[in-house]
Amino acid sequence: MLKIGINGFGRIGRLVARIAMANPQVTLVGINDLVPASNLAYLFKYDSTHGSYGGTVVAKEEGIVIDDQFIPCFSQRNPAQLPWGDLGADYVVESTGLFTTYATAENHLKAGAKRVIISAPSKDPEKIPTFVVGVNHLNYNADTDKIVSNASCTTNCLAPIAKILDDNFGIVEGLMTTVHAMTATQPTVDGPSKKDFRGGRGAAQNIIPSSTGAAKAAALVLPQLKGKLTGMAFRVPTPNVSVVDLTFKTEKATSYEEICAAMKTAAEGELKGILGYTADDVVSMDFRTDPRSSIFDAGAGIGLNSNFFKVVSWYDNEWGYSCRVIDLMLTMASKDGLV
């Protein structure tokens, strides 16, 4: 049995908790968030995007009870002061978005956790290894990897298709665009935004060009693609589900039909459950609460010639990503002898 704690009970933290509650190999032993337990229980039970939780949720003064299991809640600003050791937490999911360097994430280890999984790109990629399930997760080293990053939701969508493309046809270079659902960092109406003026515009009113490191980060899990991919984002007024558009040149002359065939083979074989394949006339909300990292849309891509193509792949940027957090932890726990 893998015992986990969650630091930061926002969109990802709550969905990781839902998925953990449904997995008999995982038990949730503690939550840390500055929000009171009564509000955390409410937000866990009712979800505007993924629907209400199917079990029972009751708020207590010092925690929440989910399906008759009491889970203590804490409100510590400094992770080093959390009682992870006393709770027996094997792993901690760091999902505040704040502690993404080695020095800050290490505080969970000082508090007694054995491993830390950051649910975001790391700001110390040279110290903290990045893993994408289905691509390089088996490279986890139980002796050295105490803090790891699960990359971003977009990298989790991009990396599997980039791997299949590079393995089969070779990628010379490529440009990625993610059309990304709005997130909690965006304001509902126009307001100030210190680093990114456009990012301060109303999320529900605008298509907003933005930066993303997701394409470059793919090289952290596929080193052979270093310097070959970059990308940008459009934030759009939808609540959930995003889509990657990858335009690329191939080393090997091929056809769009051959690319689709390679994706279908991978989706039904080595990447089953991670990569999906569809030829249906689908739209974004058809993928709400889809547990896969990336769903290749055969009908949406195009080819210009035998070496220049565009492929399209969908992802539930909340649920699919949260599923991979659990999957990565279970892979690590297997190597650590915990499950």
Swiss-Prot record:
Binding annotation for NAD(+): 11-12, 33, 77, 119, 317
The protein's assembly and partners: Homotetramer.
Pathway involvement of the protein, from the record: Carbohydrate degradation; glycolysis; pyruvate from D-glyceraldehyde 3-phosphate: step 1/5
Protein name: Glyceraldehyde-3-phosphate dehydrogenase 1
The UniProt record lists the keyword Lyase: no
Biological role stated in the UniProt entry: Catalyzes the oxidative phosphorylation of glyceraldehyde 3-phosphate (G3P) to 1,3-bisphosphoglycerate (BPG) using the cofactor NAD. The first reaction step involves the formation of a hemiacetal intermediate between G3P and a cysteine residue, and this hemiacetal intermediate is then oxidized to a thioester, with concomitant reduction of NAD to NADH. The reduced NADH is then exchanged with the second NAD, and the thioester is attacked by a nucleophilic inorganic phosphate to produce BPG.
Keywords, alphabetical: Cytoplasm, Glycolysis, NAD, Nucleotide-binding, Oxidoreductase
GO MF, one annotated term: NAD binding
Signal peptide stretch: none
Gene name of the encoded protein: gap1
